[in-house]
Every structure is written in C-alpha cells, then in structure tokens.
From Swiss-Prot:
The gene is rplU. Belongs to the bacterial ribosomal protein bL21 family. Keywords: Ribonucleoprotein, Ribosomal protein, RNA-binding, rRNA-binding. GO terms for cellular component: cytoplasm; ribonucleoprotein complex; ribosome. GO terms for molecular function: rRNA binding; structural constituent of ribosome. It holds the Pfam family Ribosomal_L21p. This is Large ribosomal subunit protein bL21.
Length: 103
C-alpha cells in the first residue's frame, strides 16, 4: 500500500514505515502530523485517485528530526571584469516517519 500526498508544494510517494524529508514544518520532534491533501492511494489492485484529493484519506506521520540540508553554492561570475560573487544556501527540512495511511 502506498499513497501520494502534497506537502510544501511538492508531491511525495510514501508507504508505511518510510522516512521522508519534507520542507520545514514548525513542529517539535516526536510530534504527530496528519496530511489531508492525499492525491492518490493504492492498495493492491484498488486504486483511488482524487479530484483533486481523495475524500477521507490521510497520511499520518511522526516527526523524527529537524535539520538543514547540504550547502548549495551560488556563483555569479563576470568575465573580463575581475568580478565574482559567491553565496551559499542551506535549506531547512523536517524528517518524518510515515506511521499510517488511511483511505
């Protein structure tokens, strides 16, 4: 059984017991979160596709950790001008473990 849900402007395909990195959620470690915007649920041959969401379906998860991702370097280089600009960025994330899928 797996489901596709939306969080932070992105879609995630998850199954029970899976650990997923999402965009930062303002929740404490150990908290439980429910995602109601489930786009699709598949249970064997039974496929439920939402228009746009599956009615009554939800994905339940537990917050494992908060953190920051790997550094991404942004470089702007101006040729022949002896000029360059560097910038770094580390995106905040929330790591959750999927504890249940209800359809």
């Amino acid at each position: 059984m797996y489901a596709v849900f939306q969080s932070g402007g992105k879609q995630h395909r998850v199954s029970e017991g899976q650990v997923v990195r999402l965009e930062k959620l303002e929740l404490a470690t150990g908290a439980t979160v429910e995602f109601d915007s489930v786009l699709m649920v598949v249970n064997g041959e039974d496929v439920k596709i939402g228009a746009p969401v599956v009615a009554g379906a939800k994905v339940v998860a537990e917050v494992i950790a908060q953190g920051r991702g790997e550094k991404v370097k942004i470089v702007k280089f101006r040729r022949r001008k002896h000029s360059r600009k560097q910038q770094g960025h580390r995106q905040w994330f929330t790591e959750v473990k999927i504890t249940g899928i209800q359809a």
